[in-house]
Amino acid sequence: MSYLPKPKMHHPDMPTNALGYTRRDYEGPISTLCAGCGHDSISAAIVRACFELDLPPHRIAKLSGIGCSSKTPTYFLGASHGFNSVHGRMPSVLTGANLANRDLIYLGVSGDGDSASIGIGQFLHAIRRAVNMVYIVENNGVYGLTKGQFSATSDRGAKSKRGVINHDEAIDMASMALQMGATYVARSFSGDKTQLIPLIQGALEHPGAAFIDCISPCVAFNNHDGSTKSYDYVREHNEAVNQLDMINGRDEILVDYAPGTVELVTQHDGSVLQLRKLAQDYDVHDRGAALAYLQRKKEDGEIPTGLLFVDPEPQEMHGYLKTTTKPLNELREADLVPGAAALEKLNASLR
């Protein structure tokens, strides 16, 4: 992956987190993406989210597929484990890694071409299997590496930079994640870090399949009049359903709010999602209502953003598979080959 090394010097008084790390310790090399690319804003949001959550970089595994979006893990969390897989296959690689070692925090980064076209089957199965992961789709509506053709998430009626009209129906990744059983579903905009950073933090702390559809304008091929993924269009049609604040489980929870305007959602690890309702009739715990809301707003030409759905009691793959709590590379021969007596007991249980 192409990159430019970043100077390691920084101000001696740069703030540190509880681990003693500065924000620079969560960065990577200098990005080689186009100047102004929305993907770089998402990378910056990931850096800040991990820094503020005091996450040890070596405990994070970042995985990606192929595309502009899949280049971005090079540019953040330089001290983390990384794997750049083949086109559309990141979800399967992530699932296998998660099964082998549940102790890591898994962050999958993909794009609308990588996950909504060639990798759509991989995406759907990873979500329905309840893999404990954060899955971010950097959604720009075009194939940026191959000069701006429409992707599967491009809206019907959208116009390409060359003036071509898209006649195909768009795939809504957030709706598909809801249908497949994701227990944390959000949508955001790369140009809104105030909204995006807490959404990423909430996803990182969520013990289940967390999905974020992040609209990320392509400044080279999809930031013009007629595009429904441009900076101007998204800003004009963005309708936030709520504003999320992330309260770390290790911090004292001090909340001052008016009844009916804020909802607190406590997760298994003690972290708290503080939701400031903007759409008063929106229920973040109703999966069916969330799907209906997305469809209704799509017909109105609006782009709902914010935390769309969260299940405070999520199911997670290791829980229902009853897998070992130890990483596979720590299992000894006695654990893997318990002997003839154990085999006979297993066979007897199946008769």
What are the residue ranges of the model-derived segments?
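Thiamine diphosphate
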Residues: 1-144, 197, 327-351
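Flexible, low-complexity linker and terminal segments
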Residues: 2-19, 220-351
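Solvent-exposed alpha-helices and their adjacent loops that cap or buttress functional pockets
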Residues: 26, 35, 53-57, 98-102, ...
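Short catalytic-loop micro-motif centered on adjacent basic/acidic residues
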Residues: 35, 108-110, 184-189
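Conserved active-site and cofactor/substrate-binding residues in soluble primary-metabolism enzymes
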Residues: 40-45, 57, 88, 92, ...
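Glycine-rich ThDP/TPP pyrophosphate-binding loop and its adjacent helix/strand module
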Residues: 117-118, 125-133, 138, 142-283
